[in-house]
Amino acid sequence: MASLSRVLRVAATCPRGRSARNLGLQPLAREARPTTEKSVPYQCTLKEEAQGASVVPQGPSQPLPSTANVVVIGGGSLGCQTLYHLAKLGVGGVVLLERERLTSGTTWHTAGLLWQLRPSDVEVELLAHTRQVVSHDLEEETGLHTGWIQNGGLFIASNQQRLDEYKRLMSLGKAYGIESHVLSPAETKDLYPLMNVDDLYGTLYVPRDGTMDPAGTCTTLTRAAVARGAQVIENCAVTGIRVRTDDFGVRRVTAVETQHGSIQTPCVVNCAGVWASSVGRMAGVKVPLVAMHHAYVVTERIEGIQNMPNVRDHDASVYLRLQGDALSVGGYEANPIFWDEVSDKFAFGLFDLDWDVFTQHIEGAINRVPVLEKTGIKSTVCGPESFTPDHKPLMGEAPELRGFFLGCGFNSAGMMLGGGCGQELAHWIVHGRPEKDMYSYDIRRFHHSLTDHPRWIRERSHESYAKNYSVVFPHDEPLAGRNMRRDPLHEELLGQGCVFQERQGWERPGWFNPQETAQVLDYDYYGAYGHQAHKDYAYSRLLGDEYTFDFPPHHCVIQKECLACRTAAAVFNMSYFGKFYLLGADARKAPDWLFSADVNRPPGSTVYTCMLNQRGGTESDLTVSCLAPGAQASPLAPAFEGDGYYLAVGGAVAQHNWSHINTVLQDQEFRCQLMDCSEDLGMLSIQGPASRDILQDVLDADLSNEAFPFSTHQLVRAAGHLVRAIRLSFVGELGWELHVPQASCLPVYRAVMAAGAKHGLVNAGYRAIDSLSIEKGYRHWHADLRSDDSPLEAGLAFTCKLKTSVPFLGREALEKQRATGLRRRLVCLTVEEEVPMFGLEAIWRNGQVVGHVRRADFGFTVNKTIAYGYIRDPSGGPVSLDFVKNGDYALERMGVTYAAQVHLKSPFDPDNKRVKGIY
């Protein structure tokens, strides 16, 4: 039996591909062929269950029903959790089909770790539900122990930034009642005597973290589900998905096919893990994930390790999971092995471990727990895991096919997120939407041009894997999968120092660096797989300046952009925005139902509105411009009769908006057409006190308040080019948006810049928009306004036509909420001290935590940190305006509290004078 120290010595001295052979272990299998006999955790349990020792399919474990309300494909963590939660919701006729045995493929060999704290409030809630299910609910329902062990979790910080990140998690945890403690190196040593703490800055200890047993959990889940009437059928591989097209041209699921018969069903849930892409192809659904090898080793017995907490040493990219009197050691490396040809025969097999890839984890583990240097290796575990382009799962109804839901791509976190995600997916299926804001997991977050783009999926999934243990900084950007979607101004702005951000494939301006050009280069895989790592990469270097929880070096550059907008004018390239036309016979009925505001206005009007879901949550905020009918003139003026509307939505969420609108149109059977002109039109926003003077020299229209009021639009000519000018502002200033055909973008931009030179016009990016908009109190969807926030809670009641009798989606929920009182309310808080905040900070009121910050930034005009978050009354009652006003507030940042002032209105221009041109 090889010791870990010998592994390191042999790996360091042997040619590549020989190290494992010299250790007497299994030879390397670079071709990724699986082996079937390995001594691994859970294998014996799985092979010795009552159903028999063989894992060779012997036909279905029970007869197939002819019909089902829901068919879940895949018996891993997500499939079993979804089945269980559907059954708990009272859904009858639910069937789970597993091609082999429960947990085969990936779940059976997973480490089963559960950490309660992550840098996302939604994920903290999902993890809490998983913990509740495995530690309490299942045992209470079935009398069976799931294998849950509460031994605690310990996060290791070997630098100050990592410790700062942990302190942020601790502050967020206080909003959810999660106990955690930042420990000194000495306190860490007392807790974990075998640990080397000489290089530590500190640790974060979470006593109620623990581990789950995959086999025990899935077995108990399915027993509980079966007791409620669900069916579990093993040894029954799915071979096809039957689809029909209805009278409106909408594709819908009708049946699942297997070698043993078919099941008629309107709903399929793809929980097939690594095989989810194959199942998707059966139905014509794109599933953007890749399969990779993911490994850990199990040590021999270690004296004194019993009852120690699980460890995540993020800076060494390694975890140490307690396994009885031994440890499992694993992690995430920069050069994982892709499994390109996923075998449909693979079930309980494993890959041979590539020690050349895995060695770095051994080094990190020995440094952290030195006794491992002389500890033997009991077994190696290297199996397939699925990873996605943004390291978030794929969930929800596929936009290509109604009734086809995804629950896959969990990036090695399927066990810990399974309970929460299974519950949300069940609600999604039954009620049409989840209860929580699941946008970060919703398959509709990806633009359709990306979900079947192999290079983008592979590059982004690799980077997500390689950076899994990296510090999560607020303004990080990917290096992989860039330059997928660029507007006509890209090269022009690059030459002027634009530092770009990426949003759903689009390159959009982040900020402007006057010192150098920062081109985004092709992805170098961090030097792995024979790629040459980029040297002196300006964009990467500037991005590195963002790796801080303090103000970055270019904070002053963003300040100049903001102040120029407030005192003169700034031009923002917002071409990445989604731009849609809503036309057709029901183009008046559909907007009445879709939009919370009354958009039944005369042509030339523009309305800011929300779109809601049935529970009154906000699915989007957008602008809707009412059009005049006529003959088609350009992408700016489509031909239509009756009513027509032009919609502008944030580019990062455009696909989500597109899918939501189409789903509502289909469900209500509205005879409407939604046309996407996002790629045909650019969008320039010129904002600031001097914007009217600048544009008056460019546009052939009278821009006075009387001729061109706020919230109106006109077709005009800009430097001879037809554009749609809309008088709106995302930053709280006098200004206009110019919606410009792609071919005209560059000449129009140059004309604007030339006219603005004498007025102090500057380029500005989205970092400035973030600051300016929070200063004005404008909402950002998916930050301080989400699908689980109502407009009433968010202070947007003015966007809702509740004073009319017009029905709209979500109206009943809003009326009920208004009658019973708001149980939470969005508040604005400012801090006098110049301290950076980014969100997740705890909100204190009168000595109690009442919420956490959703969004924060520095306001350069008011010279204060500004934060927005939802607060609750700890007594459980409604949150009245008096409750908001009559409290002493503080914000906790990284364990330090700062006195804060609460505001009922935006602290900047509360009377809305500037957007009206009143200075």
Swiss-Prot record:
Main subcellular location of this protein, as a coarse class: mitochondrion
Gene: Sardh
Protein name: Sarcosine dehydrogenase, mitochondrial
Record keywords, A-Z: Acetylation, FAD, Flavoprotein, Mitochondrion, Oxidoreductase, Phosphoprotein, Transit peptide
N6-succinyllysine: residues carrying this PTM: K38, K174, K378, K392, K535, K803, K885, K905
InterPro entries linked to this entry: FAD-dep_OxRdtase (IPR006076), FAD/NAD-bd_sf (IPR036188), FAO_M (IPR032503), GCST_C (IPR013977), GCV_T_N (IPR006222), GcvT/YgfZ/DmdA (IPR028896), GcvT/YgfZ_C (IPR029043), TrmE/GcvT_dom1 (IPR027266)
Catalytic activity: (6S)-5,6,7,8-tetrahydrofolyl-(gamma-L-Glu)(n) + sarcosine + oxidized [electron-transfer flavoprotein] + H(+) = (6R)-5,10-methylenetetrahydrofolyl-(gamma-L-Glu)(n) + reduced [electron-transfer flavoprotein] + glycine
Source organism of the structure: Rattus norvegicus
Keyword flag Acetylation: yes
Annotated positions of the N6-acetyllysine modification: K174, K560, K776, K803, K885, K905
